[in-house]
Amino acid sequence: MPLRVYNTLTGSKEEFVPINPGKVGMYVCGVTVYDHCHIGHARANVVFDMIYRHLLSKGLEVTYVRNYTDIDDKIINRANRDGVAYNEISERFIKEFDNDMARLMLQLPTFQPKATEHIPEIINLVQKLIDKGFAYQSGSDVFYRVDRFEGYLKLSKRNLEDMQAGARIDVDERKEHPMDFALWKGAKPGEPYWESPWGQGRPGWHIECSAMSTKFLGETLDIHGGGKDLIFPHHENEIAQSEAASGKPFVKYWLHNGFVNINSEKMSKSLGNFFTIKEILESYDAEVLRFFLLSAHYRSPIDFSDQNLKEAELGLERIYKALAGIDERLASGAHTPADADNTEFAEKVAGFAGRFGDAMDDDFNTALALGHLFDLVRVINRELPTASTGLLEKVKAEVAKMAAVLGICDSVPAAFLQRMKDRKTSDMEMSAEEIETLIAERAEARKAKNFKRGDEIRDLLLEKNIVLLDSAQGTTWKVK
């Protein structure tokens, strides 16, 4: 089936048809680098990394641009608070962001421009808007005339008059209209600045994205993405700037991811439920966090809680255990002839792969795609003992292909499962080695028909939340 995406601009799902056949230009708003990134930033970036991966998997040539906002009031305030230069703050948190994204297994975008490296392009764009009558100078500031742009608020579906009437807007005598927004800000004493035709100053937040997206992707983009919180004012203002300057549609498809709630409440510093990526990864594996963020449809809200993270961990382990089972069969040398294969198994694998692709083509429905992947895991576990090595190799490759679109299961299965065991036992009184020693002792006791001792060991481990799993292949264990 063709790829269909939900376009915020039209409010409907549409078939995705690139402006230039076979090529896609995608711009995603990056972070303002003044502090550590939180779970909401993680979701937005994981979502658009997944979208990037899926587009690539369909054979499209994707130019993916994600910016850094490295000059802003928040950065200046942080620099003043810490008593350092603004760029010391921005460079520090760019490194922190890059480290967080690497741990979450994001592929690098094609370009990662910084606002401060594109001041000439920003100044040229502001001047163009002034020349066309869409912007005006007021002292050393430059503002955009919102009532001059006919399509203003078409993305957020708001009404300018209603907003003006219902909002508490401080009177700003520099502005012609209360909703006008800054394109260029005159520098205050002690602030960083760049020379411009309007005096020393720096760019406003919205203009930088218009300038950088146009530089790298042209006047009309295929995809522009970000969180729903950016629809207004940021993306609305980008449209106003870019379309007024070029006279062309700015973006063909607007994509926005949903919010992250914390234990069913909106995330907020004032509520004390604000978590950085760094804090979360002290308690959970990065791949588990990524898996969790993809477990819901990207446009839906997702509820971050310990219970939901633990469920994500169990789900990811299920996939890895199936892959580990395949690896063990292949490594054992046990050979099952191909003519003994269950042809229904091979057909089911192909069917699941097709349904996975269809789910991803239906507005990147990762929740449904993961459901098909879990269905495949159940079939693998059932057919594993009797399938031929040749078929298992094909199944493993098919699972890897699906997982790669989601950016999961890139670890060696046995290594991932061991990592999970180590993490779970790190706070326990017993080490993994001690548990294995007791399991070996229990096996010897049972062999000697000393079932009382065997039961004692099982009960001792159960008291410490260690559950033993007996099978024909031996005994394994898991944390309860």
Curated annotation (Swiss-Prot):
One Pfam match: DALR_2
Residues annotated to bind ATP: K269
E.C. no: 6.1.1.16
BP GO annotations: cysteinyl-tRNA aminoacylation
Record localization: Cytoplasm
PANTHER family for the chain: CYSTEINE--TRNA LIGASE, CYTOPLASMIC (PTHR10890:SF3), CYSTEINYL-TRNA SYNTHETASE (PTHR10890)
Name of this chain's protein: Cysteine--tRNA ligase
Organism: Geobacter sp. (strain M21)
